[in-house]
Amino acid sequence: MAAPGLRDIPLLPGSPRRLSSRTVARGSQGPKHGQQYLKVPGHRAPGQRDNSSLHPSQVSRRESSRDRSVINNYLDANEPPSSEARLSRMHFHDNQRKVDYVLAYHYRKRGAHLGHGSPGHSLAVISNGETGKERHGGGPGDVELGPLDALEEERREQRDEFEHNLMAAGLELEKDLESKSQGSVFVRIHAPWQVLAREAEFLKIKVPTKKMYEIKAGGSIAKKFSAILQTLSSPLQPRVPEHSNNRMKNLSYPFSREKMYLYNIQEKDTFFDNATRSRIVHEILKRTACSRANNTMGINSLIANNIYEAAYPLHDGEYDSPGDDMNDRKLLYQEWARYGVFYKFQPIDLIRKYFGEKIGLYFAWLGLYTSFLIPSSVIGVIVFLYGCATIEEDIPSKEMCDHQNAFTMCPLCDKSCDYWNLSSACGTARASHLFDNPATVFFSIFMALWATMFLENWKRLQMRLGYFWDLTGIEEEEERSQEHSRPEYETKVREKLLKESGKSAVQKLEANSPEDDEDDEDKLTWKDRFPGYLMNFASILFMIALTFSIVFGVIVYRITTAAALSLNKATRSNVRVTVTATAVIINLVVILILDEIYGAVAKWLTKIEVPKTEQTFEERLILKAFLLKFVNAYSPIFYVAFFKGRFVGRPGSYVYVFDGYRMEECAPGGCLMELCIQLSIIMLGKQLIQNNIFEIGVPKLKKLFRKLKDETEPGESDPDHSKRPEQWDLDHSLEPYTGLTPEYMEMIIQFGFVTLFVASFPLAPVFALLNNVIEVRLDAKKFVTELRRPDAVRTKDIGIWFDILSGIGKFSVIINAFVIAVTSDFIPRLVYQYSYSHNGTLHGFVNHTLSFFNVSQLKEGTQPENSQFDQEVQFCRFKDYREPPWAPNPYEFSKQYWSVLSARLAFVIIFQNLVMFLSVLVDWMIPDIPTDISDQIKKEKSLLVDFFLKEEHEKVKLADEPTQRSQGGGDRSRRSRAASSAPSGRSQPGSIASSGSQHTNV
């Protein structure tokens, strides 16, 4: 059944024949040929007869008399392939029609056995009406094929109908014979000019017109500055044609067959680039129906039902081919997808041309994000160096390291731990100052403004790219892309109708197009989706609870391991370092494992919801995956930053878990140093292992596995296997493109590491920058060399990812405010310096933060056994703001505690509002649309109107010239006839002087 609305479409320009369901001929089924072969009409000269109207014997004689034969790409080289050499491996075998898209499927037959001939001569292709010589039964080289099983037969019939409907839409197909017992078949699709023109007009694709104009750079100063920058950055520019003339731009206008005179069509075969051609074919594939496959709509449904294995556009040749032959893929590899060109800018225009706007915007965003990491990395290094430079001048660190200050500290554990001097923690205190100093407050404010400036500049770059890439007015295309329902959604609707109405509902569904029937019974309501929503809610809560449980398990590991190591005198001195390092590594391994699990769970939960369109599916998948991975990655960090050491208790009244294990507490210098260690290991580990090793190693392992599988797979010997493979074979062996969600997700999580806890780890932007320099080339190499070519998708922005980035930027302000106020000692130092210090300095700050405890009040069985402390201890110190034992309310929170707590809350409020105000101010000061782009858009609209009117005037003028010439010839003939009769006319007064005159002589 042909697709609705696509009947009676001329297949080729100038062809009088209309393609209908009867014109698709089938190959004869001889006694030894059980497979039907699809014949597709090919190029014919005007007046050429259609073979479909001839008798089969006449067809056979006509085909046998042809000079050329279209052969299989694996045919024996002894048979001459064609009178012409192959132009490229991206064309049909007639060397004329370009392969715009490829459908691949795997077939299997039973009971096949070879005839008497060599299998190398048994292959032929019936392609677009041009065939090789007919092989009659009993001839050498025949392949006797057994019957297909029921499932394979059903799939074959569905493929035949779908391919017939594609031809009814005007596409031209070429496919190979299923000559072996099993194997892969590639259906090559070519879109002729009239199909490209029709679909381009339907999709409103903007194409360049004849008119070009210069993009002005602004005033003279701006021009000079731009010229200087271009000269200085010339070594960093990729050597691609797009950068040679970037000051000129074509006016673009939606394609219209009635206004062909507007466009600069020099050659129809190359007017639409490869990405646009494949995009047009993909649109046809998505809306072509197949009634045998339960009236499913589109190629995605057929792939989901295993009718086809894959569908993909071809790459532009090989990226590592020898010689000087250049194509866009090879150019991208040389100037972008190699680690040796890491210092160069990205050829964004060429990326967009080859992969489409969606992938082009991703790499543009990644490039801008990486470039913005440079100033933040410089400031972060300066902050770190400031901490290094001022470490000798830090008064609290000097007091802690001073052995004359006899601060006898309470035991860190029960029984086995002894009293200890605070000066033994000198190294921890000095290291904490590297990250806990006044400069980190400034850096937190800077990073909050940095995030705002990054998002604002991205909006500006997005508008600039939208102008150069003609993405204005793309909303209609996005709405059209949402019209196609997902195969799973159609299946659920069909199951619903089957349950409600039985066979009558199925008949109704087959009689009406799924796109046209909008009744409630033909779509899923909230009642149908409620079980899925309930499952989603319960599963997400379970996953979050699982993450928290694992974090708690690691906490228990830290507590029990610390207690066990404290029993041994040899390991007692390194307990804190050992426990911290091993716990962070465990956290990292768990995060990496759960990341993979949560990604699969998020996809499964989204499928349960049964979203209608691909865009809705992608948005819901992104939200679920981000929520689960965010909780997974940051839960251990949130624990160290805000909860560790807050529920320890005090000497004599410690908090215990599992009846004997004390809750862990922070180091004497605070938890900020441990937070820094946790952040650095998790961030670097994720980037090194997950983002790089997995991305490099896993594809290589998959490729090796496929290669070993192909070598060990049983099958018939193929004598042509040593021949150079075709491009569709090479692309089929690549990994399928699965979307940009993993690429964005890893960068968004990294963005969170850079912004959320930057107050505790100012070097995070440096490590992110180093990772991204590699990440850009790693992703580029993956897209160019390891993935099948994605379908070109037009989009004007990065979608929901921008909202997530904006949310993280706002959330980071709150998190950094609490890190500075709660985790660091910045606020206690300010309170002491301006409220309790006698001389306005930090002298005496350490003593101010330590409380007294009477050791005689320790619980029975918790005192140190065999204490070797060199002096008798009456009072020990612990870090907290509590009343001394001799106070009326011993061990209660002191007045200093409430003063510090009030100052911390006040700082959070002031910091948050100040940074938010500055962020809004920066947002207001930086316009979303650059002024020059706004002016150029207005100018382009004016130029387009002028150009359109001028071309219309020229068209009318050219159309009027033949009429004027014909009218002028008639006037001259009439004047000559009047001149011949003039003498007699003038002798008669009152006669008409001329036949063309409307006046009389009176």
Swiss-Prot record:
GO terms for cellular component: chloride channel complex; glutamatergic synapse; neuron projection; non-motile cilium; nucleoplasm; plasma membrane; presynaptic membrane. It is a multi-pass membrane protein. Residues 978-991 have a biased composition (Low complexity). Expressed in retina, especially in the photoreceptor synaptic terminals, and in olfactory epithelium, particularly in sensory neurons (OSNs) and cilia (at protein level). Also observed in retinal pigment epithelium (RPE), olfactory bulb, brain, and cortex. The chain crosses the membrane at residues 365-385, 434-454, 537-557, 581-601, 622-642, 747-767, 800-820, 906-926. Residues 49-59, 992-1002 have a biased composition (Polar residues). Keywords: Calcium, Cell membrane, Chloride, Chloride channel, Glycoprotein, Ion channel, Ion transport, Membrane, Transmembrane, Transmembrane helix, Transport. Glycosylated. It is found in: Cell membrane. Residues 386-433, 558-580, 643-746, 821-905 are extracellular. Homodimer. Component of a presynaptic protein complex recruited to specialized plasma membrane domains of photoreceptors. Interacts with DLG4 by its C-terminal region. This is Anoctamin-2. The lineage of its organism: Eukaryota, Metazoa, Chordata, Craniata, Vertebrata.
